[in-house]
């Protein structure tokens, strides 16, 4: 692995859409007791179910600490690769690399600067030094050259269509706890350089009470060129109502990089979900970590799914809303099997399926 001084844009590399072909998927293993209840055992079961669902259509690798290596190897399916990688938590989407490809069969990776969603100004834990090393270690294992981007950002803050368009939110990427020295125009320029996009569509806020600070992957994502899935609610009393309405209007009036209008598909969120007293009691309190309390509203969204080669793996919350969301996703992905996985235990930790996965795209001609 080489660390390159150029940029993907300059070298002819781009970030492909998640719905393009993959070579595989990376995840991390949960274990910290101040974020995952009951010593992370319930969360580990959910991660295992997600890994198994994805492994039915593409290779899956899971990074695990030395202390948890034998436990993870014993629990995960045999067709899932287990690799020792130190990390501070288990959010591969955010601390892992963003892979980019060119038209000559080559793949490289972008290593963003990670500060645990805000550093000492609203971040979720300290320290985060091992997380900031994860992307480089994954790229080393994948034999992919590395671009170290001068931008504090997480993979969940962006969604691309693979044809020059990027979705993000002002709440996240313009937050002073990420890049206070950069203007909106300068942030856009960095996205152009490292993703090879030519159009950035800015939505205002992410999902209500998303503790990452407004990640796009809870709110909206591309399902195919010109098509966007959007978290939705018809409940005017829910703060999410105005957020989704504003996002809908921005998307409906936007053009993508190729000049197309966007078709927006509403994915109704589940009824508001809250952390129970029993769940909160199972989480240890540690200094420097985001507290989790009974009654906290959980940022539940059906948009936080993973698009695999042959499958879409979606979170399950409650039967009625689950069924409606699955019907919508089957319509949006007619050539893929839609598989639901119960992931409340992941949600309790602050994210969901998309947050714990990172696709490895297959370069053209490979």
Residue ranges of model-derived segments:
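Histidine/cysteine-enriched polar flanking segments
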Residues: 1-366
């Amino acid at each position: 692995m080489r660390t390159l001084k150029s940029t993907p844009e300059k070298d002819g590399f781009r970030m492909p859409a998640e719905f393009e072909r993959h070579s595989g998927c990376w995840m991390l293993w949960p274990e910290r007791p101040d974020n995952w209840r009951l010593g992370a055992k319930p969360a580990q079961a959910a991660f295992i179910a997600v890994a198994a669902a994805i492994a039915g259509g593409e290779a899956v690798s899971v990074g695990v600490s030395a202390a948890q290596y034998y436990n993870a190897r014993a629990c995960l399916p045999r067709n899932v690769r287990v690799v020792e990688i130190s990390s501070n938590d288990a959010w591969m989407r955010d601390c892992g690399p963003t892979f980019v490809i060119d038209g000559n069969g080559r793949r490289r990776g972008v290593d963003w600067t990670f500060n645990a969603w805000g550093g000492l100004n609203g971040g979720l834990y300290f320290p985060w030094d091992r997380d900031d090393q994860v992307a480089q270690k994954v790229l080393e294992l994948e034999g992919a050259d590395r671009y170290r981007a001068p931008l504090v950002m997480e993979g969940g803050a962006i969604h691309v269509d693979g044809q020059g368009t990027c979705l993000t939110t002002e709440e996240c990427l313009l937050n002073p706890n990420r890049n206070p020295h950069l203007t909106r125009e300068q942030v856009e320029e960095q996205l152009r350089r490292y993703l090879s996009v030519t159009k950035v569509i800015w939505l205002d806020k992410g999902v209500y009470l998303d503790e990452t600070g407004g990640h796009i992957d809870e709110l909206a994502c591309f399902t195919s060129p010109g098509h966007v899935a959007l978290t939705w609610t018809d409940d005017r009393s829910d703060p999410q109502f105005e957020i989704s309405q504003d996002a809908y209007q921005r998307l409906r009036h936007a053009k993508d990089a190729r000049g197309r209008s966007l078709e927006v598909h509403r994915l109704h969120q589940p009824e508001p979900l809250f952390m129970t007293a029993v769940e909160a009691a199972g989480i240890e309190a540690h200094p420097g970590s985001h507290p989790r309390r009974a009654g906290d509203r959980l940022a539940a969204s059906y948009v936080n799914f993973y698009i695999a080669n042959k499958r879409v793996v979606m979170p399950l919350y409650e039967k009625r809303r689950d069924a409606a969301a699955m019907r919508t996703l089957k319509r949006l992905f007619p050539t893929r099997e839609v598989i639901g996985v119960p992931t409340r235990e992941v949600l309790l930790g602050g994210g969901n399926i998309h947050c714990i996965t990172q696709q490895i795209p297959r370069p053209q001609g490979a």
